[in-house]
Amino acid sequence: AETQYPSAATCRTCHPKQYNEWAVSQHSYSQLSPAYLSLSNKILQLSNGTNGDFCLRCHSPVGANLGENPRMSNLKRHPTSREGITCMVCHRINKRYNKVSGRLDLEEGSLLKPVYGPLGNAEMERVLNNKDKYRVVTEEGEAGRQIHISSKGFNHLSSSSFCGSCHDGTLFNGFRLE
């Protein structure tokens, strides 16, 4: 799964400040939280499993996209799945969804694939135009620090409706989660 959905630890190499902020955030613990795990298991029990991957889709989008069973132990999950809402969960989405289901259309791919964000490509171009200075590479197997081939503009990433895909959840019985 690292080649499909790179780990946040991989992103840390170039983005230590952002990684450190994420590492102490609720996003990094979303799949590991004992409160979440208890509630998710209870909901699955009360719904006789018909709730499916509803909780997993937001708490571990990578796990949901990998098809992991919602009842699977975290010990058996892929390490990137255990990271919860990791860097690629937000930066590998390139279209508006505007639905509150957590069904995120994550683009799969290695670290070399493009990422998306509100700032676009200016900084990435500066680094790519100075590959030797920054010792970065954009080809599999090249010696050096791998970097995305581009960063594409996606202003929706900084909108509340983007976050609302998960942060505006309601259970099947109408109970509002947030």
For each feature predicted by the language model, list its residue ranges.
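Sequence context of c-type cytochrome heme-c attachment sites
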Residues: A1-E83, K95-S158, G164-E178
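Elongated alpha-helical scaffolds
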Residues: E83-V89
